[in-house]
Amino acid sequence: MAHSLGGFGVLIPEIERFNILGSIFASSLFPERAPKGCVLLTNYVGGARAPHLADETTDRLVALTVADLRRMLGVSGSPVFQHVTVYRHAIPQYEMDFGTHLQNMNDIEQHAPGLLLQGHYRDGTGLSDS
């Protein structure tokens, strides 16, 4: 592996033209997750940029990902472990008018005391302040 894998991982901007959207360096964060001499990477492909990839075979997704990892991180060799999960609608992509929807949710909460609207559809996919 040419890259040191220091840090949390990497997000890939669209202009770079990779299939991978991002990669988490799991074994850098949690060394016990990979045997000595191996690394564990969690990779994300497809998304709103390339939704057609959700229809690809597992073998094709692995091949595309490994090819990107070779170019991006200098990965050599072949995977000794792989697991592919396809989530067709995993992370919401907010539309330009999302602010209007957010305001509507705020208005509804103000007119219905005790009703709280929470979740990824409102506050994003990470941890929020709520």
Residue map of PLM features:
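Short, well-ordered amphipathic alpha-helical segments that serve as non-catalytic structural scaffolds
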Residues: A63-D68
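A short coil-to-beta-strand element that immediately follows conserved catalytic motifs
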Residues: L5, G74-Y87
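Mid-domain catalytic core of redox enzymes
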Residues: M1-L41, A48-D55, D59, R71-M72
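A conserved FAD-binding loop/helix module that cradles the flavin
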Residues: G119-S130
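FAD-binding beta-loop-beta segment adjacent to the flavin cofactor pocket
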Residues: L29-K36, Y87-L117, Y121
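Hydrophobic, well-ordered secondary-structure elements that form the walls
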Residues: S23, N43, L69, Q82, ...
